[in-house]
């Protein structure tokens, strides 16, 4: 084979390649997740009033699939951090994020959640992205409902463009691994 022929060969790892059926399923899962967001509002300050107005009939967040807030992080896939987070609340917020099931997304709602706002002191966390990853930042003090809907549509576009896999590889059973180790030691 000539060197020119070798340059035309494309190699991929089997784990990274996606078949036709899996790509169709991924698009279907993306569409379903995009329009069925289960939100967990973590409201701590004045932005909470604007968050409630987004759910009112004038702006109607339910047409974007984020209708009912969940009151347990284990049932939610979208964490809406609404308002100022102080340093005493930071471990609680991180724990809430860790309790959420995969896939999960985070929206920083307002300037205080995004960058600490005008509370630049020792007690306020200067942006929630210091402790948890943030997918969408919604600016404003407080942000208008229209901005919130724009941020939600940005998140929906991001979710729709992601690759969604049905199931990841299963991890080895630790009990079975220990049993196999004990059996090999007895030989």
UniProtKB/Swiss-Prot annotation:
EC number: 7.1.1.-
Xref: PROSITE patterns: COMPLEX1_20K
UniProt enzyme class: translocase
Keyword Iron in annotation: yes
SUPFAM superfamilies named among the record's database cross-references: HydA/Nqo6-like (SSF56770)
Subcellular location: Cell inner membrane
Residues at which [4Fe-4S] cluster binds: 46-47, 112, 141
InterPro entries: NADH_UbQ_OxRdtase-like_20kDa (IPR006137), NADH_UQ_OxRdtase_20Kd_su (IPR006138)
Function of the molecule: NDH-1 shuttles electrons from NADH, via FMN and iron-sulfur (Fe-S) centers, to quinones in the respiratory chain. The immediate electron acceptor for the enzyme in this species is believed to be ubiquinone. Couples the redox reaction to proton translocation (for every two electrons transferred, four hydrogen ions are translocated across the cytoplasmic membrane), and thus conserves the redox energy in a proton gradient.
Family to which this protein belongs: Belongs to the complex I 20 kDa subunit family.
Protein name: NADH-quinone oxidoreductase subunit B
Native species: Myxococcus xanthus (strain DK1622)
């Amino acid at each position: 084979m000539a060197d020119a022929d070798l340059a035309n060969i494309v190699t991929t790892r089997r784990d990274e390649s996606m078949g036709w059926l899996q790509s169709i399923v991924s698009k279907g899962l993306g569409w379903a997740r995009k329009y069925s967001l289960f939100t967990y509002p973590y409201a701590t300050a004045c932005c909470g009033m604007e968050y409630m107005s987004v759910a009112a009939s004038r702006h109607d967040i339910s047409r974007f699939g984020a209708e009912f807030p969940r009151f347990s992080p284990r049932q939610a896939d979208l964490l809406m951090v609404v308002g100022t987070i102080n340093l005493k609340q930071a471990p609680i917020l991180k724990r809430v994020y860790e309790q959420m099931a995969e896939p999960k997304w985070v929206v920083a709602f307002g300037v205080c959640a995004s960058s600490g706002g005008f509370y630049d002191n020792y007690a306020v966390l200067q942006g929630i992205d210091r402790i948890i990853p943030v997918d969408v930042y919604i600016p404003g003090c407080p942000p208008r409902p229209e901005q919130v809907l724009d941020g939600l549509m940005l998140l929906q576009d991001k979710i729709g463009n992601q690759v969604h896999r049905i199931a990841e590889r299963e991890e080895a059973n630790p009990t079975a691994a220990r049993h196999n180790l004990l059996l090999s030691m007895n030989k």
